[in-house]
UniProtKB/Swiss-Prot annotation:
GO terms for molecular function: copper ion binding; electron transporter, transferring electrons from cytochrome b6/f complex of photosystem II activity. NCBIfam families: cyanin_plasto (TIGR02656). It comes from Ulva pertusa. PANTHER family: PLASTOCYANIN MAJOR ISOFORM, CHLOROPLASTIC-RELATED. Keywords: Antiviral defense, Chloroplast, Copper, Electron transport, Membrane, Metal-binding, Plastid, Thylakoid, Transport. One of its GO terms (biological process) is defense response to virus. This is Plastocyanin. The keyword Metal-binding applies. PROSITE patterns: COPPER_BLUE (PS00196). The lineage of its organism: Eukaryota, Viridiplantae, Chlorophyta, Ulvophyceae, OUU clade.
Length: 98
């Protein structure tokens, strides 16, 4: 699995790393690293055609350090992801599924 931290070790509001590549069906573990409330929203305008962004998003907040959400993406292409409360601070990432 690929691990993506929600929040940098330095307390930054960021996905770390901000770009990953995965094989179709490979697990992606989103882990709250900082204890700030974060969520994982797939941008409906930035996912491959036919993908239901709402179905793969995790809208609830991960509030505690160590809380984890796992997603597996099966449709190849590029996915845009953001954290709803911190999108204005630039908390966004890109996932490329091979």
């Amino acid at each position: 699995a690929q691990i993506v931290k929600l929040g940098g070790d330095d307390g930054s509001l960021a996905f770390v790393p901000s770009k990953i590549s995965v094989a179709a069906g490979e697990a992606i573990e989103f882990v709250n690293n900082a204890g700030f409330p974060h969520n994982i929203v797939f941008d409906e305008d930035a996912v491959p055609a036919g993908v239901d962004a709402d179905a793969i998003s995790y809208d609830d907040y991960l509030n505690s350090k160590g809380e984890t959400v796992v997603r597996k993406l099966s449709t190849p292409g590029v996915y845009g992801v953001y954290c709803e409360p911190h999108a204005g601070a630039g908390m966004k990432m890109t996932i490329t599924v091979q």
